Swiss-Prot record:
Free-text function comment from the UniProt entry: Receptor for relaxins. The activity of this receptor is mediated by G proteins leading to stimulation of adenylate cyclase and an increase of cAMP. Binding of the ligand may also activate a tyrosine kinase pathway that inhibits the activity of a phosphodiesterase that degrades cAMP.
Subcellular location: Cell membrane
Tissue specificity note: Detected in brain cortex, and at low levels in testis.
UniProt membrane topology term: Multi-pass membrane protein
Gene source species: Rattus norvegicus (Rat)
Disulfide bond positions: 27-40, 34-53, 47-62, 485-563
Cellular compartments per GO CC: plasma membrane
Signal peptide region: none
Assembly with partners or alone: Interacts with C1QTNF8.
Protein name: Relaxin receptor 1
LRR repeats mapped onto the chain: 105-125, 126-148, 149-172, 173-196, 198-220, 221-244, 246-269, 270-293, 294-317, 319-341, 342-365
Domain LDL-receptor class A per the UniProt entry, residue ranges: 26-63
Keyword Transit peptide part of the UniProt annotation: no
GO BP: adenylate cyclase-activating G protein-coupled receptor signaling pathway; adenylate cyclase-modulating G protein-coupled receptor signaling pathway; extracellular matrix organization; hormone-mediated signaling pathway; lung connective tissue development; myofibroblast differentiation; nipple morphogenesis; parturition
Amino acid sequence: MTSGPFFFCVFIIGRYFTLGNAQDVSCPLGSFPCGNISKCLPQLLHCNGVDDCGNQADEDNCGDNNGWSLQLDKYFANYYKLTSTNSIEAETSECLVGSVPMHCLCRDLELDCDEANLRAVPSVSSNVTVMSLQWNFIRTLPPNSFRKYHDLQKLCLQNNKIRSVSVSAFRGLHSLTKLYLSHNRITFLKPGVFEDLHRLEWLIIEDNHLSRISPLTFYGLNSLILLVLMNNALTRLPDKPLCQHMPRLHWLDFEGNRIHNLRNLTFISCNNLTVLVMRKNKINHLNEHAFTHLQKLDELDLGSNKIENLPPNIFKDLKELSQLNISYNPIQKIEVNQFDYLAKLKSLSLEGIEISNIQQRMFRPLINLSHIYFKKFQYCGYAPHVRSCKPNTDGISSLENLLASIIQRVFVWVVSAITCFGNIFVICMRPYIRSENKLHAMSIMSLCCADCLMGVYLFVIGAFDLKFRGEYRKHAQPWMESVHCQFMGSLAVLSTEVSVLLLTFLTLEKYICIVYPFRCLRPRKCRTVAVLIFIWITGFIVAFAPLGNKEFFKNYYGTNGVCFPLHSEDTGSTGAQIYSVVIFLGINLVAFIIIVFSYGSMFYSVHQSTITATEIQKQVKKEMILAKRFFFIVFTDALCWIPIFILKFLSLIRVEIPDTITSWVVIFILPINSALNPIIYTLTTRPFKEMIHQLWYNYRQRRSVDRKGTQKAYTPSFIWVEMWPLQEMSTEFMKPDAFTDPCDLSLVSRSSRLNSYS
């Protein structure tokens, strides 16, 4: 923005191409032609980086070159062609401005004094046409600083330390067309400071400290086309005709200021304005007639402000508008007919806006719309006539499939099958393992039921992925708002929280039995049943509470296609964010810490009790087995929960997380415990392994009998005794005759528990 060649390059790159003869081909709604051939492709295959048409037509014209790039084409192309031709013809390497200051360079009538340690404007020949004084130490521009330079056309004063500009500093610069004052410390410009600059076309005052302006500030700028006031400290614009003395102004840029509202009279005289940029301000209110007189406006950028409400007729008079950006505003509601008058609109940006009442009717009048940008890719289904809709995916789903990745589509079934089969198998086999501690068995059965719900959740997600295969964009938003999605999300959270609480309870039970074997702390039947009921009730409350208060939680489970609320920040509800943090960084994190501490204490306690044992080598071996088992339990918990803790913490501090992470967490990380708990707590335990060995032994015995026909097989009971924990075993069974001392009994008790892990 600081030189002509830059804008010329932007113009060349941003040229607009039409679609050729594509309009001659008739395609169904949601599909678009492949250039001048009769082939049609759906919206999702256009501008995806792949030549799906075969003639590259689906990848042509994908750039959004509407708005300011077209204005460069219209207003500056011919000018640069003419000036560049003249400069080539007249170019010479000889210096024609006489003597120049030290550290300065001269060529033809151009003076380059960049980084020359200047503290004032140098004095050179009056015929100089270009003067660049960038990166110096000029602090003030006194009166008549440039008065003798009548032929000066371009003046660059960027990156100095200018604080004060005299009202007559630019007097006499009747030929000046471009003035750059960017990156200085200017706080105020007096009325009439540009009075003599009748030919000035570009005025760039970017990155200064201007706090106020008035129409008189720009008095005399009759030829001004481009005015850039980016990144200043303006808090308001005058409620007077700002363009009163700039009748030819086409481009006005106020990006990065602190403007709070736009008044009705501010732009009343800006009849020729084609580009208005107001992004990154603090605008929270728009008067309904603020843009009424901008009937030639081609681009309006109101992005990244604090606008909550759009007046119904705010865009009514913008008949020529081709690009509109209202993204990243906390807009509460967009009227169905909000864009009805924007028939020429080609690009619409609605990123970062939750459109609760979205429908096709909103965008149907926008017959020329070629690019649209949403917060959620699911909204693209409501603009099927728009060729380029972004984003194409949220990292989990795509316009085509609920699960975007083929790996996820396959493994959702694999993980679901493993989880369901493993837990159902344990539930079915548990009655055949007669546990001396029925309360422990009851807890394990309850854990399997909770883990099985995770498998059901994954199964349903896989089923709906199959149902929507190839046309998910049509069903995306209704699916995420549906009762099915809300219920399955609740089921996943119920499974997760009940599993977490049950694992914590089982761990504390083991901890008490091993570390305090002779204290009366063991839960009885009524107490255990009460704890299990309490855990399930708590899980139901945590999981289903968001469904009971939509105003507080918004669409808590419907922020993504898999219906899991890992990133509750997407809901736009502070309450939902706090609730999610309490669950993932409160309940679950505390539970994980308790489990790690308890298993560490258990291992230490068993290790201390076996130091005095006579069979040291046996005890060391048993300790190693115990250590491995404890490590595996803690490791699987850590593998499941630590990534979730990290992701939740990063999202809480607003660190950008790749969109694809959520789906991988839900399908591969979250079900780890649900899939492995049956293995850890049943299938690898000593009673179960002994039962399997006994079944194999019986099978071999029967085969032997069948072969011999005479020998009768010994067939023990199919029911096996589970040896751990030994809470309900009789005293006679627990206490050997050789030990009568409580300390020795403690050793035996702990050793018995140690044996049960092997």
